[in-house]
Amino acid sequence: MKIFKLLLISILSFLLFACGEEKPEEAEKVEQIFYTVMPRQEYKLNPQSYSENERALLTQIFEGLTELKTDGVRLISVLNIEHSDDYKEWTFTLRDDLKWSDGEKITADTYLDSWLDTLENSRSDEIYRMFVVKGAKDFYNKKINKNSVGLKVQDNKLIVSLNTPIKNFDEWVSNPIFYPIRKENINLSLDKKIVNGAFKV
């Protein structure tokens, strides 16, 4: 009887060991397709200038620093967010693995250049959101140069100085007007747009 028990234990141990050694098969990559119904109109999908109808689609193909959900702010392109005690200076530390769909790296400089370009060229109704940044409105109105705007980069950190305290500035930057941009997208068809979000058109 003892021999039978030992034999049974040995067999079970072997089976457990064998199962543990099995390498799971690589999950087959499945193309994910997102369908949405949009009103008939011309779509440019430009974060610098977009209609309310385009906003829902923009948030699927582009990503900003954060995303506003029902349960609060979700960090998207940043590792962490810090602010001064008076909420007038905010520091966004970006992830190191951010890339555009064509493989080009996205850095803190990408955001700085994009925000300045948006202030310089956008005529969107949403541009007022950027005016909370120190000097942004004056730069938009061509009164000062870009070096006087409250934006700077240190390593992979985007440091933003505000005119007044904004306790929810991490929510503020979830708006598409704060998304990074690629200038060449202006001349590209919708299916050729260079994006950084989960989907492409």
Question: Would you name each region that the model predicts?
Answer:
Residues L151-P165:
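Non-catalytic accessory/assembly modules
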Residues I81-I127:
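Aromatic- and charge-enriched surface segment that lines or borders ligand/interaction sites
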Residues V37-D86, I194:
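N-terminal lobe/hinge region of extracytoplasmic solute-binding protein
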Residues T59, E63, D109-D117, E171:
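Solvent-exposed, polar/charged alpha-helical surfaces in well-ordered, non-transmembrane soluble domains
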